[in-house]
Amino acid sequence: MLTEDWLIAERRRKLGTTRLERPVYFFLGDFSDGEDPSRPASLVMRLRDFPPETLTFTYPDSMASLPIATQDDHRLHRKPYHGQVFTLDEIRLVVAEFGMPDGRWKADPAMKYDKFIEAQV
């Protein structure tokens, strides 16, 4: 629950009060790594169809981002974007600097946990 509490507090700090107390989680990009048979299909939606004041993001997913930023055993994988919650404008800047995760995690051990960007709506 620690991660979700952190995520909700940061979301509230950046966006103020939102319609939902707990966000609904989505992923940006291609999440079909083939390793999770419980996810046989995807729903593709345009990001611009969502009001920006309803969106926050973590890079990678929130359950990985916070531990990478705070636990010593993840020091070697830590990047400036870990442990942060971003607005739409902020995540655009992060992607402009670091790129989308894509498949880099498969070939680069330093990107091992950075498989996708999580969107919280």
Task: Go through each PLM region and give its residues.
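ADP-ribose/NAD+-binding catalytic cleft of ART/PARP-like enzymes
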Residues: M1-E21
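Conserved NAD+-utilizing ADP-ribose enzyme module
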Residues: L20-R22, D33-A41, R48-V121
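Conserved catalytic/binding loops enriched for acidic/polar residues
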Residues: G29
